[in-house]
């Protein structure tokens, strides 16, 4: 009997990379001329980014700097869920961005439906915040990976534990 192969579909954000990107972005903000004397800041509180600045325009600039640094460090920006801009103390504005870790039930169902529509001999299991795909043929697994990558999901997915 042939051994089954499998892999896991996950959605993870590496927090050390996020911290590094924040530090680089803060360094750039401190050195930029248009931010001289401004109260712009980026903080990471557990899995929530807090962006603070003087006004909405500068907040957008801070967000642009942060996104560029996150992209350079290969952090998926699809997994950032921005809240609304709110006023903070001292005539500043603040925006929270939640880092989405793991695949929620709705996205797991979407991935499951994508795989089932292919009509290959593969089995899928939703395990907490990941989806495991098993099959006897590694070619089928490769086809599943290609299909899931080709679909535009609201979160960024990675494929791990390919055995």
Curated annotation (Swiss-Prot):
Domain of life: Bacteria
Gene Ontology molecular functions: nucleotide binding
SUPFAM superfamilies: YajQ-like (SSF89963)
Protein name according to UniProt: Nucleotide-binding protein BcerKBAB4_1061
Family membership noted in the UniProt record: Belongs to the YajQ family.
Role this protein plays: Nucleotide-binding protein.
CDD domains membership: YajQ_like
Pfam families on file: DUF520
GO cellular component: cytosol
NCBIfam families given in the database record: PRK05412.1
Record keywords: Nucleotide-binding
């Amino acid at each position: 009997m042939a051994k089954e192969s499998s892999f896991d579909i996950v959605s993870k954000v590496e927090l050390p990379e996020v911290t590094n990107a924040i530090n680089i972005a803060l360094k750039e903000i401190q050195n930029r001329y248009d931010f001289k004397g401004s109260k712009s800041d980026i903080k990471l509180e557990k899995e929530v980014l807090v962006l603070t600045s003087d006004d909405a325009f500068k907040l957008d600039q801070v967000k642009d700097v942060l996104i560029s640094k996150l992209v350079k460090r290969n952090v998926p920006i699809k997994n950032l869920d921005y809240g609304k801009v709110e006023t903070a103390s001292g005539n500043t504005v603040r925006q929270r961005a939640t880092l989405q870790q793991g695949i929620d039930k709705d996205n797991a169902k979407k991935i499951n439906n994508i795989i089932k529509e292919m009509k290959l001999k593969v089995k899928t299991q939703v395990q907490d915040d990941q989806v495991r795909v098993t099959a006897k043929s590694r070619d089928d697994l490769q086809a599943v990976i290609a299909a899931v990558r080709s679909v535009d999901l609201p979160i960024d997915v990675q494929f791990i534990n390919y055995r």
